[in-house]
Amino acid sequence: MLRLHAIPFSTNVERITLALAYKGLQCELVEHDPDDRSAILRLSGQELVPVLEDDGEVVSDSPLVLRHLERKYPQPPLWPTETARSAELDLFLDWFNRVWKRPPNAIADGIGGITEAAELRGSLGYFEALLAGRPFLFGGGFTAADATAFPFIKYGLVFDPADDEPFHRVLIEHLSFGDDHPRLTEWVRRVDAMPRAGDS
């Protein structure tokens, strides 16, 4: 069985639990104390989650884990089969991970301010436009784009009050939306209703 190492409220772990459930894969979810990641370090050589164990192979870093799952368990697919569309999705993932996440990280680290907050807030219109006439970010079906973005964007609409992670509090404060972004609101609720691996 697949084994996924996690900490509570991890956005990057939720990317993987969504993908696993979408692919119908069973996994054992192993939760670690955020303040003691020694077991994660021993297993993977680094302290970040998610870390996936799959038949003796250890994979860390959520984009790499998503790619691993797609390669080893290709159905149902998280990437379009068309070469051009698949490349477009890769560009979106790279933009989200390297560009979109920069402002909230800067704010959480105390080095960001008004400019970063405006960038973060301004990105909501981009997602609203992507969802015009379609239920998911890249069309009619769930893809790696939804798995990648949802765990972060959701904080503008839904969150657990017990989650006091500073980065997440930044998202709650600067991404709040509702009727002003109706398509985005529907998308968050649509993906939020999807199962996750490890759900009891």
Spans of features found by a protein language model:
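GST-like domain detector, emphasizing the conserved glutathione-binding G-site
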Residues: 1-129, 135-137
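Alpha-helix boundary recognition
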Residues: 41, 189-192
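Generic structural signal for individual residues within well-ordered alpha-helical segments
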Residues: 66, 87-90, 148, 185, ...
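GST-like fold's C-terminal all-alpha helical module
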Residues: 96-190
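Long, charge-rich low-complexity segments
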Residues: 192-200
